[in-house]
Amino acid sequence: FLSSADVPKPKDVLGHEIGEDYFLASYEEAIKYLKVLDESTDRMVLLNMGKSTLGKDMLYAVVSSEDNIKKIERYKEIARRLSLCEVSPEEAKKLAREGKAIVYIDGGLHATECAPAQHNIELVYQLVSSEDPEISSIRENVITLVVFPNPDGMTMVSDWYRRNLGTPYEVSPLPWLYHKYVGHDNNRDSFMANTVEIQNLSKLIHHEWFPQILVNHHQTAPFPARIWIPPNSEPTNPNVHPLIVRWQNLIGSRMGAEFDKEGKDGAISRVHFDTWYPGYVTQVVDSHNIISILTETALYRYATPHFYTLRDFPEEYRDLTISAFYPSPWKGGWWRLRDAVEYVLTASRAVLKTARDHKEELLLNIYKMGRDVIERFKKEPPYGWIVPEEQRDYPTAILMLQRLNLLGVKIYRANEPFVSDGIKYPAGTFIIPTSQPYGLYVKNILEVQKYPDLRKYPSLWQGIVEPKKFEGAPLRSYDVTGWTLSYNMGVKAIPANTPLKVNMSPVKEVSLKPGKVSGTGSFYILNHSVNNSFKAMNRILSKGGEVLWTKKEIQLNGKKYPEGTILVPVSSVKRNLIEDMAKELSLNIETTKEKVNGNSTIKIKKARIGIYQSWMANIDEGWTRWVLEQFEFPYESIHDSDIRAGSLNDRFDIIIIPSQEPRSIIEGHKLGTMPPEFVGGIGEIGVLNLKDFVEKGGKLLAIGDSCDFAIDILKLPVVNVLKDVKPDDFYCSGSILRVECDTSNPIAYGMERESSSFFEYSPAFTVIPSYGKEGSAKSVVKYPEDSILMSGYIHGEKMLFNKSALVEAECGKGKAILYGLSVIHRGQTHQTFKLFFNSLYLY
């Protein structure tokens, strides 16, 4: 491409070419260059979408022609009105002719996949500086947003690489997550939007810019391909307009043609990456009528080059046989960061050329898709979802509605009582109609998922003349198969199967009703079924107040309260603290003047909590920290050296081992693969110290894969019945399952006896009757004897019948609690948070 002489190149500012061997620009360096560029041209503006988790300004570039930049607010308004279907068909045609295509392109969400973020710098430079007619016409017809979705991670990776450059550890993995809390799961958070980065992106996409195309670049191509591009693999999520799939295929084909035109071999499609799960940055927008494009470029490690021969290839690729979706196989050779950057640039340019060539059609299509969805759900169910204000956990129900609203969903409230499907609802009830532009997203998130068993549908995924039925184990999904949000969050949300006939008004902002304290007396009464009550308890305990839980059902003020009801002696805490918490946390707190028998309550105390943080960069550990911080549980991270040092009871009452493969807990990174301070796990001495900790009265909480570790080292009378089971016999990669809770056990206080839970390659247990010195174990949560699946997919569910999902086991003076269920899965499973939180106190 031709460049304007006056525009500074990246090397002029950074001292390096983008993609140069052994150089990774940090986020700060990228922004330094873009600020210089911004000052040098009127073809771009640099905008701020908010703060990252670590407090960095999340800046993004908007690139177009000089005239378009001047009228940017007008083009945003056109995109918004078309996306939200706020105009007539005739007006839509006029706006489409006037408007510009808006294309969102990001790179660096997964920070160790370095090329996409580096490409961002070069892409902005090329779009701003080139006078080539191809680029000039893109600027004239397209507004391009170039986004860095993980600034913190981009700098973490750059710093780590520079630290080890030229040492034996040059290509070592990071020993910590490249996002403070969630690491790789930042691309699994898009519908829940727990992280501030995803919240910022959601506001940008669904409330400000309303792009017609979203491109999310990654760098994990199926080897030896050099880049993966659409079409996607199967299964396809059913809650997308057919035009989305058609345009994904069209754009993918345009990309493939551009790669071959430029002599860039190795583009592959229709393998590995499906579109089922809406937690990705890409798939979450599909049901918002935005065409999502994923790419996955090849990666060695960081900016270090690598040479490949055919001997490195999997056997089926060594003879370079072509296929319909891999017509120009890569033959091997050197692979450098600059090569990967060039491939990503080609992909981005292909998208922008397509947007340029079809600008008016794209703008009309997003309008057409929205109108189609509106009309469809005027005529067929589900007509929407009804969310009563009366909930077991009202603040969590409001949180669910807030997250839907953040993702662009319109929420309404009934102005008067109404009837739906024979059920009476009062005024004030929340209503989420599907007859709105993003109605498919509503359906996608709130309906029950039924994941297809691909063995039954060979024609979906076998591109051969005569598809063959597959008789082996279930074909694995790329990610989880069921995510029904109301089930995971424990919110009552009822589908409307008949047309909604109700006078309702839109809710501008979904917010909590302030709670209040009623009456005076000797005890405050809090509801254990409300997750915000744990925030309240933690604040009370931190101020030196007292907290009691009732052991059994109790009658106070002429009313019955269930076991686990929270009582706070009025004399132990200032009333203004209680009133402020009630208002902020939406807790309706009652009081009682009645006396309470001390033998009928449990006094809980604040515990000293340690969370094991392996140098293996454990995503579940990060989510555990995130959840604890949201609910104000104080904790301390502990590492291998802390556990090896022993005397754990002097520092901690409770130690949490997040889900991690047992061997990696003990062995960690191998010698020579990492700098010495990050090598090795807790070792055998650490195993002995953890055993000593429990036997002397400590509490060990093991989650997921770590349960086998706890069972083995503590010799618990518990068996993981799924430990060595093959996928032919049992498979469940991420589904919502029915469980039964023993609500007489303090661990299950606040739970309903029948509940939903999340299962993701989880263990399940049988308890062995034990009469020895090791102590006994008891089931707290178990799977019923039939009808386990609530949403998703499970193969071999009989293996779970009457098996335990959560076990409490005694060991010496202490105990271990085994969480087979995914109790805090990605910060989504508010329904089961209580099972975790109840174990984080001393009682």
Regions inferred by a protein language model and the residue ranges of each:
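Intrinsic-disorder/low-complexity accessory segments
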Residues: 1-114, 118-142, 182, 188-189, ...
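Carboxylate/His-rich catalytic cores and anion/metal-binding grooves
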Residues: 124-127, 131, 139-163
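Short, solvent-exposed turn/loop segments enriched in Gly/Ser/Thr/Pro and often Arg
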Residues: 146-150, 161, 216-224, 706-707
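Feature marks short, surface-exposed loop/turn motifs that line or immediately flank catalytic pockets
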Residues: 152-153, 221-223, 301, 663
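Active-site-proximal cap/loop segments of hydrolase catalytic domains
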Residues: 154-179, 183, 199, 203, ...
